[in-house]
UniProtKB/Swiss-Prot annotation:
Top-rank taxon, per record: Bacteria
InterPro entries assigned: MPN (IPR037518), RadC_JAB (IPR025657), RuvA_2-like (IPR010994), UPF0758 (IPR001405), UPF0758_CS (IPR020891), UPF0758_N (IPR046778)
Name used for this protein in its record: UPF0758 protein MADE_1000235
GO biological process: proteolysis
Motif (JAMM motif): 173-186
Binding annotation for Zn(2+): 173, 175, 186
Family: Belongs to the UPF0758 family.
Keywords: Hydrolase, Metal-binding, Metalloprotease, Protease, Zinc
Domain MPN per the UniProt entry, residue ranges: 102-224
Molecular-function GO term, any one: metallopeptidase activity
Length: 225
């Protein structure tokens, strides 16, 4: 049944305008982004198919083009719309970090890093370069690894820190396994990097490990001593 014949109070777009996006279900939000359905299916029906195929809202926005296309009638244009929306979300978080004191906004930092790294299929090691006010200068992916490791070289980190003229840094890497618990190797590496950065008087404020369901802060765990 076409959404046009639904009562106005039940149409996703009208509900959003009247009650706000936070009051829509995942399927209704997807339907608004889709705009319209495909032959024989309205936008809400297609949205449910996407959720069933890709598992959840996160699966929809992080799916590959081929995965997205498994739902009949959904082409590259719709995929591009969802990717653009997800990128806007990530950039908005980055802008927020650039305006605020990163170290005093651990939850915002976690959300930003989750958006950056949670769905990467290979391990990545990155630095948040901070100025003297602990505001974000840049996010730098320093090393790309395999599904369970990434080789990290402190000398290369020092070189990039000096190029960016960072006053402090935050370390971050993801665990593609989905488990964010820091390993003994993670703790040893953090100690090595702290020692290397001390040689140029740049403090390491935190080290985040991004997993599937959580992001762990070394500082909150007392692991930076």
């Amino acid at each position: 049944m076409s959404i046009k014949v639904w009562p106005k109070s039940e149409r996703p777009r009208e509900k959003l305008l009247q009650y706000g996006a936070e009051n829509l279900s995942d399927a209704e939000l997807i339907a608004v982004l889709l705009g319209k359905g495909v032959k024989g299916k309205n936008a809400v029906s297609v949205a449910h198919e996407l959720l069933n195929e890709l598992g959840c809202l996160r699966g929809v926005v992080t799916a590959t083009k081929d995965e997205f296309a498994k739902v009949t009638g959904i082409g590259p244009c719709k995929y591009a719309q969802f990717q653009a929306g997800f990128e806007i979300f990530k950039r908005n978080l980055e802008i927020k970090l650039q305006r605020e004191d990163v170290f005093n906004n651990v939850d915002d930092t976690k959300r930003y890093l989750q958006a950056k790294l949670r769905d990467c299929q290979r391990e990545k090691f990155a630095l948040l370069m901070l100025d003297s006010q602990h505001q974000l200068i840049a996010f730098r992916t320093m090393f790309n690894g395999t599904i369970n490791s990434a080789a990290v070289y402190p000398r290369e980190l020092i070189k990039q820190v000096m190029i960016d003229n960072a006053a402090a840094i935050i370390l971050v890497h993801n665990h593609p396994s989905g488990v964010a618990e820091p390993s003994h190797a993670d703790i040893r590496l953090t100690t090595e990097i702290k020692s290397a950065m001390a040689s140029i008087d740049v403090p390491v404020l935190d080290h985040f490990v991004v997993g599937d369901k959580e992001t762990i802060s070394f500082a909150q765990r007392g692991l930076l001593t």
